[in-house]
Amino acid sequence: MRKPVIAGNWKMHMTCAQAREYTAMFLPLIEATPNDRHVVIAPPFTAISSMAESVGGTRLELSSQNVHWEDDGAYTAEVSPTMLLEHQVRYAIVGHSEPRKYFSESDEQINRRARSAQAHGLIPIVCVGESDEQRERGEAERVIRRQVEQGLEDTDPDKLVVAYEPIWAIGTGKTCEASEANRICGLIRRWVGASELIIQYGGSVKPGNIDELMAMSDIDGVLVGGASLDPESFARIANYQTS
């Protein structure tokens, strides 16, 4: 049985003080959230420690926004799996379209990050998705399949999450039709050959479309950006209803 993962990616938002204030508002809103789903937030690295103090014993789980493949070393601006594990972090986002774009992260590097996360007991959330130009040229499926095959090489699909995030829908207000997102997620499941693989959709997810997205047969959660910055908005997403 695939247990959905509802994850909020705060990106470069929230100071430690703001994160504590958010958590105090958010936790009561998910006290009655059904146990058939995971609720996760990926704060900036600076806020992970303070949030870990607040979320222990609650429904809320923590993710990092990236993770390196080494335990330590001369890797300025990176964070290691062992550092994250000290702060109750359970998930690690890898391969998000922004590091791919701004820091030229390759599929090989993303795979190394994912394998390292798994080796340390973290659950990688491996992001894949096509740009608007690739979609217009009819290359979307080829691009996504390459990212999936190279990014997941030598990993255990039962201990990771794949997030399909069409780049053209991230932060643009454009949303991939639920049926099309479901079709792509189904393709990813078949390419990986793992019926229990958890596959999220990410791209302008908001309270107004969460119920439709989560009603799809191959969508097992969402990776939320802007809408996760408001506790009431993200709580509505976490408390989605499909019937």
UniProtKB/Swiss-Prot annotation:
Gene Ontology MF annotations: triose-phosphate isomerase activity
Pathway(s) it belongs to: Carbohydrate biosynthesis; gluconeogenesis; Carbohydrate degradation; glycolysis; D-glyceraldehyde 3-phosphate from glycerone phosphate: step 1/1
Keyword RNA-binding part of the UniProt annotation: no
PROSITE patterns (UniProt xref): TIM_1, TIM_2
EC number: 5.3.1.1
Pfam families named among the record's database cross-references: TIM
HAMAP family: TIM_B
NCBIfam families xrefs: tim
Protein name in UniProt: Triosephosphate isomerase
UniProt organism field: Prochlorococcus marinus (strain MIT 9313)
Top-level taxonomy: Bacteria, Bacillati, Cyanobacteriota, Cyanophyceae, Synechococcales
